[in-house]
Amino acid sequence: MEEHFVNPVQKAGPTGGKKSREPGILKAADGIDWNEAWKMQRSQKAVIKRDVNFWDNKARDFFKKPWDSNYSDDFLKIMEPKRCWTVLDMGCGSGALAIPLAKYVRRITAVDFSPGMLELLEEQCKTKEIDNIAVIKASWEDNWTSKGIGSYDAVVASRCLVVDDLRKAIMKLHNAARERVYISTIVGDGPHDRGMYEAVGRRLTPGPDYIYTYNLLYQMGICAHLSFIKDYRQESFQDLDAAHQYYDRFLGELTNSEKVKLRCYLEDQLVARNGKWVLKYKRATRWAVMWWEKE
């Protein structure tokens, strides 16, 4: 886990750091409108947009990811949660963050637009005997008040800022928080394997990364702390067919020609190890974590 602060005088942690003022209105003198820049980059990205049907159909496959991850542990170290906190986990998925966070806070409201993901989260809560997580089915675009989303000590949006209007999403998070807001998003290519895209003849344009978010926060008058998480991954599978099926879904709507190219690439890059098929190379996915305090 790496950490970086734009202003070295500010100290990160529960007792340090300059609090943000209330987000202001953009002025012409501010130069680049980073929300519009975000929208433009979003419109040019080549990565497929995954809707609710995608996540419902693939929930269990994505829950059983073919690699171990240090992301949640590192995020919690940055977050430094308090036992008395109520937390909103927006875009919670199957509970990658909510499940480990539950033992450190008073109550979590976990929100996602995928019923399949929420079902997996509730199953885990039952299995692990976790009784302080409540779920709400809602999206970024919904009226949060009408969905029962209120105010919370801390608000989290972890790896889920897949929105067209970033400023509006940030304002929703900010307004729902009493003390702090935490968001995380991709750095560079994020979780996307550039070599995999090139192997099937596709150009990887993952869309806007963290710098758009950070610059927009600054433009809105929010002086956010900035840290980085490096999440190492080396995917492993039971067999070649399982690997091919996984990446076929991840890349999205492959043609027959692309499927042949993908299979050839995997045959070349997968090696047998301890009864599984493992990619020869290990990748480091970097995530940017930004957080700020309410005044």
Predicted regions and their residues:
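Conserved class I S-adenosyl-L-methionine
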Residues: 4-82, 84-93
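Class I SAM-dependent methyltransferase SAM/SAH-binding core
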Residues: 96-142
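A short SAM/SAH-binding and catalytic strip from SAM-dependent methyltransferases
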Residues: 152-167
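A short glycine-rich, Lys/Arg-flanked "PGG" loop and its adjoining helix->strand segment in the class I
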Residues: 167-182
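Short, glycine-/aromatic-enriched active-site segment of Class I SAM-dependent methyltransferases
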Residues: 186-204
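Short alpha-helix
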Residues: 206-221
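Conserved Class I S-adenosyl-L-methionine
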Residues: 225-295
